[in-house]
Amino acid sequence: MDHRMENTEEERPEKNDAKDSIMNKIQQLGETTLPQLPQDTNIHCLTIIGQIEGHVQLPPQNKTTKYEHVIPQIVAIEQNPKIEGLLIILNTVGGDVEAGLAIAEMLASLSKPTVSIVLGGGHSIGVPIAVSCDYSYIAETATMTIHPVRLTGLVIGVPQTFEYLDKMQERVVKFVTSHSNITEEKFKELMFSKGNLTRDIGTNVVGKDAVKYGLIDHAGGVGQAINKLNELIDEARKEEGRMIQ
């Protein structure tokens, strides 16, 4: 009798923990079970969502991607021999220019195959991140906003500040044009276009138009992006095999 009571008491906490875990999943994710990546997967998925946070902390209600979280992940991906390819999923409104460029530069310098896909939006400084990979995709309904670098809500009254922003803008233009098929002339034309955006300068590029301009390589979805990444991984393996021989 005593043994049965002891077993029952031991089982109760485990059942309560299981119930709490299920309730947490329902509250946070709306699901009781979640699909998991296999342990032996050779592809890592990195999501860049919301606003890219730089040196200034954004309000807690904002969904953000913190560059100090992303950069160590990119370093770990480069060093991990089990990871052979990286899939970048973008749905960002933009954010800190220098933080976004830092992420884009790191992605462009990876020795492993990389593929990006823009879902929803890849606006502002999200554009350099989208083009930083070896191959880029955009969903047909996704958009990319191209506009000049600016300080939100401030009037630029000091010439040095204007010059600094102008140089930063040139860095963005140079990076995008050197990592995609769009020309500098066309990119600047889209950037300084008037009448496309309400009360702003710039252009909102949708889906296949981004491909037409040479900004993105292909219009497609997650399945196509993963297939392309696997192709690039196979090519990298063959190249490595040739070097060893």
From Swiss-Prot:
Q: What compartments host this protein?
A: Cytoplasm
Active-site residues annotated for this sequence = 124 (nucleophile), 147
Chief location category: cytoplasm
Segment Disordered: which positions? 1-20
Q: Which UniProt keywords apply?
A: Cytoplasm, Hydrolase, Protease, Protein transport, Translocation, Transport
Q: Which domain of life is it from?
A: Bacteria
UniProt GO cellular component terms: cytoplasm
Q: Name one GO biological process term.
A: proteolysis
SUPFAM superfamilies linked to this entry: ClpP/crotonase
Q: Which GO terms describe its molecular function?
A: peptidase activity
**Per the record's keyword annotation, is Disulfide bond included, yes or no?**
no
Tell me the function of this protein: Required for efficient translocation of pre-proteins across the membrane.
The similarity annotation says:
Belongs to the peptidase S14 family. TepA subfamily.
Q: What is the recorded name of this protein? A: Translocation-enhancing protein TepA
What organism is the protein native to?
Bacillus subtilis (strain 168)
